[in-house]
Amino acid sequence: HPIIAEAATQFQARAIQELYPAGGPVRTIIIGEADDELKEQASRVKEYMNYQIVEEMPEFFPDLDKMLFHLPLVGQTFKKVWYDPSMDRLTARFVQAEDFVVSPDSTDLRTSPRYTQIIKLSRNDYNRFVKAGYYEPLGPNEGGADIEESSTVESIEGISAFGAEQDDKTVVLLEMHTYYMFDGIDDADSSDIDAVALPYVITMEQESQTVVSIRRNWHEDDENQEKREWFVEYKFLPGLGFYGFGLYHIIGGLGKVATGSLRALLDSAAFANMQGGFKLKGRVPGGEMDIAPGEFIDLDAVVDDVKKAIMPLPFKEPSGTLFQLLGFVVDAAQRFAAIADLNVGEANNNAPVGTTIALIEQGSRIFSAIHKRLHNSQAKEFRLMMELDSLHLPDEMKFASSGAASVIYRADFDDRLDVIPVSDPNVFSSTQRIAQAQAVLQMAQSAPELHDMYEAYKRMYEALRIQGIEE
């Protein structure tokens, strides 16, 4: 039964609209008192980061799109934000939970003492990183292991481990974010039980256990040597440990019951429509007969012998009770997954806007909570991007945005600004956004002396996602 697939598809379709609007997903806020200089700086950062995501990072939207479909199914995904030396630019890539190893007892990545990303590269891509100085070269007999077994997800999807691309052996790397003490490098002595280990990123090739890179994982000018973060957690529902819960965990049992009930109904209908049974050997002549609708065929048999010679098996019609059970299970799953159609369109057209908003919020409580988690995670992702831009951008760079030449300065990415998603954590759908803007506009029209009509209409246009409002 497609109940889980339907829930995942509808969630993905709603979430992608909120997290990646047409005008770009980033907006800025000013920390402290705003002046004209800060406002211009905030405008430059917002304009550039949206340009960066939409134009310079073509992988951002496909990865986000794919991640938002995986997330409701498995409950936990990750995004890795880093500077890719092979592309010489910033990137943010989707990392599946099965390629990320962390202790289930960890609270979050910031306090986790160790976590590991499993990276699979072709030998050619690995050599590109070597050429960029990111990894050490492997020996002729190191790396390039054949992957003989498909992963669980690949097995479900029907993807074979063997194919035309197996000639290009895969290099499997283990990128470990951990704390370590190197004798002769760190100030502390590893034999001292009170010594404090420092954060490092240590990468090794899985098959040969060869270390291919060691990098400090703190800012060079950071006196406290705090661990830097490169990964962002995205959770569907909080789990009992580190990993979150998805639809498979919560309503997977209902999905199995619905699938079993549907199959039983189909089997029952098939047997009832295509009956078989027993017939006495030799009592009715064999062979094939073509019978047209409304036609009677002559048989060489004694009258009343046909009924006595043939006995069909008593297959029952599909059970009404089983059909009711299927409906109950599907309704229960839909209520939890919040994919049932909202009854907003069926409401009275003359009902107050507040009633419409209440109906929307009541029907989307679960999605509202999930949307707040997505908003917080995406805000962290944008802050990591802002931090990397402050380190890797040139002092001044020109870029084309909205058909005009614009400029961004590396000094713009300072602590006087913060970047957050355009999405509102309290507004989880375009329907709710439009209803709220409509309520404001109606109140403004009823008491124009108490409201700024320009601002009321502007909010309505913004809720409708109309471009070029100022024109």
Predicted regions and their residues:
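N-terminal-proximal low-complexity accessory segments that begin disordered
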Residues: 1-34, 38-84, 96, 100
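Long, basic N-terminal domains or extensions that often function
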Residues: 87, 93, 99-100, 119
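C-terminal anchoring/interaction modules
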Residues: 1-2, 29, 37-52, 66, ...
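Serine/threonine-rich low-complexity intrinsically disordered regions
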Residues: 173-178
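Protruding loop/beta-arch "assembly-hinge" segments enriched in small, turn-prone residues
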Residues: 238, 244-249
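Extended non-core architectural segments that shape protein topology and connectivity
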Residues: 91-94, 103, 112
